[in-house]
Each structure stands twice: as structure tokens, then as C-alpha cells.
A protein has these predicted regions:
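Alpha-helical transmembrane segments of multi-pass membrane proteins predominantly involved
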Residues: 1-490
Length: 490
């Protein structure tokens, strides 16, 4: 399983081609051919779903080829793209998130009065950028993928053009995102200067031949880390996340908090387990400090929030801290733990935000904690699903969230990071407290709005699927653990 197979370049690129073609087709049709806003709704059925279906089919073909041929990876474009278990694992996560968000957006955009075709086009183009982040093994490929994804999210965060907070969030995200990309580009330029190549394999060998405490190597590590830590909203580069999560359409917040975070972690793992692997003595103490600060700020700030989206934003920040612990451990259990965590986090976080989407109705924004009051009495199904998602986010068995935290904590114990494991456990207790605020509001609070929550068939399907997966992964984890095991970088 250690051999390489260099295929027809287009075989590797087919998923990205499908996403780009359908995404651009939607943008062109929306601009020139479909001026009627009511007809734009059908772009979802005619272009988005077929585009995602063809993307899924091409990923399945790549996965089948790897299984049948016995090769460990497929390379293309002289090593700039690599399809392996790692890339396929993350690309399936991106596809699932894009599919769920697209399905639930149909009715949500009706309520917001913002049915514009570019919404769906940007979802597909953002996923195209994510494909390059998971598959890229070249600095140029990775940077192009990152910027394509980021540019799409800058626009989607500000999609509610009539709302000041949406415009403000997009502007903050754009400015800070561009600033972080500058740091990342500077770090990449140093990598190129050290190695004379943009290929990750060549850079890894060149950096390994140098002293980890060489000032040039340390500067490369520091600037690259700043850019990467911003993308996963780690402290102290997290300032954009609460505003972006609150200001964006809730469906986009769900997409940003799951698919974008997964893509950013795929990027981070490619770099830290590749070019920066030999510099571990320099970055490990810094990453420990960042992880502790991220868990601290994320969990403590969430306690004071009255807006559900901001609360979940700080929760998302704290989860980034937990995932960083797996990288700090650095063993196979830790990296597997990150993969498992990202998989389960996708379903439980999507589900939590979809409940907020369900609360949104004409005249009711549905984002305050008080909007959950009495939900058990008027819409028990939604309350039970939200309970499942919150228990999973807190890491309570038998939900999937427990599995993710278990492997992260196990990796810390295996590598002797006992104090980190204790600190992380204490912050789990803090998280249980603020998640319980939402549970108490749903089950004990008095309903301010007596009418039951109504939603589209697509939203109900997405919520049910997310809830089932959140429980299934926790109760019967074996196939999902095998799936995550195949994602380990060789």
C-alpha cells in the first residue's frame, strides 16, 4: 500500500471540475437568463443537487480505484494534487455539509427575501476551494484553494445586504482574512526560499535538514502558523468568528462553522505534519499555549452570550482548541482523534444551527436564547433533537461528541500530556454549564410564542439525518472509526 500511481490528471481533478462548472453555470444563468426571482428557486434542483451528485460520483470512483488497485494515493499535475484516504475523507465531509446546507436554504432564503442565484453558485465554488485544500500538496495549489474558499465566504457572510450586522461582519472578516493571508503568503515564500520548490515533499526534506531554532526557520513557522490559526479561529486570532457567525445567514453560519473549519484543519494538518514536522520543538510550546487560550476564551465567553449564534461561535472556538490537542499529542491516536472529531462535529454543529434555522419565521428572528423557551411544550421533536446536538457538543455519551473527545484525551494520556488532559476535562465541565442553559430554556422555560415551529420538508430531513448520525456514530462507531483511520497521512 506504499506505492504511487500517477494517473490521468483529469481523473483527479473531476470533482473540482464538476463544482466549478455547475457553480459558474448558476452565476451566468442568474445574471443573464433568469431575471425572475421566483424562478431562481429552481436553480437548487436543476444545478446544485445534480452538481453535488456528480461530485459525489467522481469521489466514489476515486475511492473505488484506490481500493481495487491497491495503491495508497493517486498523484496528478507533477505532484501538485494527491488523492489519498486523507483527501477523500475530507472531501466527503465537504460534500455532506454542502448538500445539507443547500437543501435547507430553499425555504430559508424565502423567509429572508434574498433569493439570489449566486448564493448556490458560491456554495459550490467554496467547496471547489475546499477540494484543493484537502487534495493539494503544493503551496500554490493550497493557497489558491484557500483564497477561493475565503472569497466565497466573504461574500456569503454579507449576503443579507439589508442588515447592518451582516455587512459589518463581512467587512471585518474580509479585512482580517486578508491580513492573515498575508502572513501565510510570507511564510510560504520563506518555505520556497529554503527549498527552492513549492512541493510539500521537497520543502519537508529541506526544512528537516536545518536547525529547528534557525531564525529563518522559526520565522517561517511563526508566520505560517498565524495564517493557519486564523483560519481555524484559534485564540488570539478568533476575533472575526463571533461577528461573522452572528451576521451571516444562519445557513451560511452552519456551512462556515463545519465545512470551512474542516477544510482549514485539513490544510493545517498537511502543513504541520509535513514541512513543519521537523520544527516540532519550536512550535509545540506555542501550540500548547494557543490551545489552552482557545479553550479558555471560547468556553468562558460562551457563558455570557444571549444570542444562540454567538454562543455557538464561541463554542466552535473552544472546539478548535480541543482539536489542536490531538496535533500536540502528535501520535496516530491524536491524528485519528482529530479526524473523528471533525466528522462528528460536522453533524452535531450542523444540527444545532439547523434548529436555529427552524426557529426563523416571518417576524421572528429566532436567534436569542429566549426564543428556545418552552420549545419542548410546543415542538417537542425540535427540542429533543437540539438536546441530542447539545449533549454531543458537550461530549456526553452515548452521543458522537463523546467519541471525538475520548480519542483526543486518550492521545494526550498516551503521550504523557497529563496536565493538558486535566485542563481540557475541566473546560468540558464549563461547556456543559452553558449548553445546559439552552436545555433548561427549552424544557423549563415559558414559551413566549405559542405557535409550534414549522419548517420545510428539506429542513426536517436534514435535522433528522444529523440527529441520527450524531447518535449512530456514538452507539455504533466501528465503521466510522475505520473511515477516520483511512484518513491518516502516511
Amino acid at each position: 500500500m506504499n506505492q504511487y500511481y500517477t494517473s490521468n490528471d483529469h481523473f483527479v481533478l473531476v470533482p473540482a471540475i464538476m463544482l466549478a462548472l455547475f457553480g459558474c453555470a448558476i452565476l451566468l444563468l442568474d445574471t443573464w437568463i433568469i431575471p425572475n426571482p421566483k424562478q431562481r428557486k429552481y436553480l437548487l434542483l436543476v444545478f446544485v443537487l445534480p452538481g453535488l451528485a456528480l461530485t459525489g460520483f467522481s469521489l466514489w470512483r476515486q475511492q473505488s480505484f484506490l481500493a481495487e488497485s491497491g495503491v495508497s494515493e493517486i498523484t496528478a499535475f507533477q505532484g501538485s494534487l494527491t488523492v489519498d484516504g486523507f483527501a477523500l475523507f475530507f472531501n466527503w465531509i465537504f460534500l455532506i455539509a454542502a448538500l445539507i446546507v443547500s437543501i435547507v436554504s430553499y425555504k430559508y432564503l424565502d423567509i429572508e427575501g434574498e433569493h439570489h442565484g449566486e448564493y448556490y453558485g458560491l456554495i459550490l465554488l467554496a467547496q471547489c476551494g475546499m477540494f484543493f485544500l484537502a487534495t493539494g500538496t503544493d503551496l500554490i495549489t493550497l493557497f489558491i484553494g484557500l483564497e477561493l474558499m475565503a472569497l466565497c465566504f466573504y461574500i456569503m457572510v454579507g449576503f443579507l445586504r439589508g442588515e447592518r450586522r451582516s455587512n459589518e461582519a463581512a467587512m471585518k472578516y474580509l479585512i482580517l482574512g486578508a491580513f492573515s493571508s498575508g502572513f501565510l503568503a510570507y511564510g510560504f515564500s520563506i518555505m520556497y526560499g529554503i527549498s527552492g520548490s513549492t512541493k510539500l515533499g521537497d520543502i519537508t526534506a529541506a526544512v528537516a535538514a536545518r536547525d529547528p531554532w534557525d531564525p529563518v526557520v522559526f520565522l517561517m513557522m511563526a508566520t505560517t502558523s498565524i495564517g493557519l490559526l486564523f483560519k481555524i479561529s484559534a485564540v488570539p486570532f478568533h476575533m472575526w468568528a463571533p461577528d461573522a457567525y452572528e451576521g451571516a445567514p444562519t445557513t451560511i453560519t452552519a456551512y462556515l462553522s463545519t465545512a470551512s473549519k474542516a477544510a482549514s484543519f485539513a490544510f493545517l494538518l498537511r502543513i504541520f505534519l509535513g514541512p513543519l514536522a521537523s520544527v516540532r520543538p519550536a512550535w509545540e510550546p506555542l501550540l500548547i499555549a494557543v490551545a489552552i487560550a482557545t479553550m479558555t476564551i471560547g468556553n468562558l465567553a460562551a457563558i455570557t452570550q444571549s444570542n444562540i449564534k454567538r454562543l455557538l461561535a464561541y463554542s466552535s472556538i473552544s472546539h478548535a482548541g480541543y482539536m489542536l490537542l490531538g496535533l500536540i499529542a502528535g501520535n496516530a491516536t491524536g491524528i485519528k482523534g482529530i479526524s473523528v472529531y471533525i466528522l462528528v462535529y460536522t453533524f452535531m454543529n450542523l444540527g444545532a444551527f439547523l434548529v436555529v434555522v427552524a426557529l426563523r419565521r416571518k417576524g421572528i428572528i429566532g436567534e436569542d436564547v429566549d426564543d428556545l423557551s418552552g420549545l419542548m411544550h410546543k415542538s417537542p421533536g425540535y427540542a429533543v433533537l437540539m438536546l441530542v446536538f447539545l449533549l454531543s457538543l458537550a461530549g456526553i455519551p452515548p452521543t458522537a461528541g463523546f467519541l471525538g473527545k475520548y480519542y483526543i484525551f486518550l492521545s494526550l494520556i498516551e503521550t504523557g500530556h497529563y496536565m493538558l488532559a486535566v485542563v481540557a476535562t475541566l473546560y468540558v465541565a464549563v461547556a456543559i454549564y452553558y449548553y445546559f442553559r439552552l436545555v433548561r430554556s427549552m424544557f423549563v422555560g415559558e414559551a413566549t410564542e405559542k405557535a409550534p415551529v414549522t419548517s420545510s420538508v428539506g429542513l426536517r430531513f436534514a435535522l433528522a439525518a444529523s440527529g441520527i448520525m450524531t447518535l449512530l456514530v456514538g452507539i455504533y462507531p466501528e465503521p466510522f472509526l475505520q473511515f477516520a483511520q483511512r484518513s491518516l497521512l502516511k
